[in-house]
Amino acid sequence: YYIQEPSAMAPASILPVEDGDVVLDICAAPGGKSTELAAKLHGTGFLISNDISNSRAKALLKNLELFGIGNMCVVSEAPNKLSTKFYQTFDKILIDAPCSGEGMFRKSQSMVTAWENNGVELFAGLQRGILNEVVKMLKPGGTMLYSTCTFSPEENEQSIEYLLSLDDTLELIEVPKYPGFCNGNPAWGKTENAELEKCARLWPHHIEGEGHFVALIHKKEAEQTQVFQSWIHRGCKPDKNAEEFFTHISADAGIKSAYIEENNGRLYYMAECMPDVSGLRMLRQGLFLGEIKKNRFE
């Protein structure tokens, strides 16, 4: 495991994930926020954790496996590829956006070096590219959370202004202001939209953590909501090897034999229902349990 920075715990705890939700963590590595989102699902719904970097996605997968999550899929794709596949699919989306990392300067010299080499303009552009695609994937009635670990208005208030300009059904909702949390600053936006006060800034001199920014955005319900994503439903009869394995598992573990699948001797615990991820760079669907070798389980 690794110890998550205190301020970095805020985004996943604030996003109001409910049982049965279909959730996307689009910039998920190394996985701390994804594990919190999965915990809030209580084994229901489905979580897609994505990171565009294949090497970072492997680290993400390792942490999700350690957490024992079965109702999940880890992919490594660009946002535009995901939006083509998952149009209006997700009830909740977490965007922990790549940023200049100003909030981490006192903790990490590497963040200072990255800022000197790239500046805020590069990251503001990356964020807008992600937001262009994420807005397409959120269901009407759904909620997304945008966060960064930087101070710059270009990557925070101004990125939220940009997001709101993409779709007139989007609206800011108030981020819970825990002790030490401050409002977003409308004066730092280009339009000075008073609604930006609903965002939250976490300043390191006010809290026992590093700098962070959090915004909650809701997409209003449409008159008619269509289901665009195709879903794969699991069958109810496990194969022979899975059946034998299940007989040795305590019922207290909460494992259902119908959700165990075998692939070349490897057993996986899968969700009852999951989105179709064909055509995507998928690292793992479900939880790897072990292998059947010479009539024994390893």
Give the residues covered by each predicted segment.
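Helix-to-beta-strand junctions that scaffold the AdoMet/dcAdoMet cofactor pocket
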Residues: 41-42, 138-140
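Conserved beta-strand signature within the Rossmann-like core of class I S-adenosyl-L-methionine
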Residues: 143-148
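Core SAM-dependent methyltransferase catalytic element
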Residues: 166, 198-227
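Glycine-rich nucleotide cofactor-binding entry segment
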Residues: 1-89, 121-126, 173-196, 202, ...
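Polybasic, low-complexity RNA-engagement segments
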Residues: 210, 218-298
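Class I S-adenosylmethionine-dependent transferase superfamily signal
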Residues: 37, 127, 134, 141
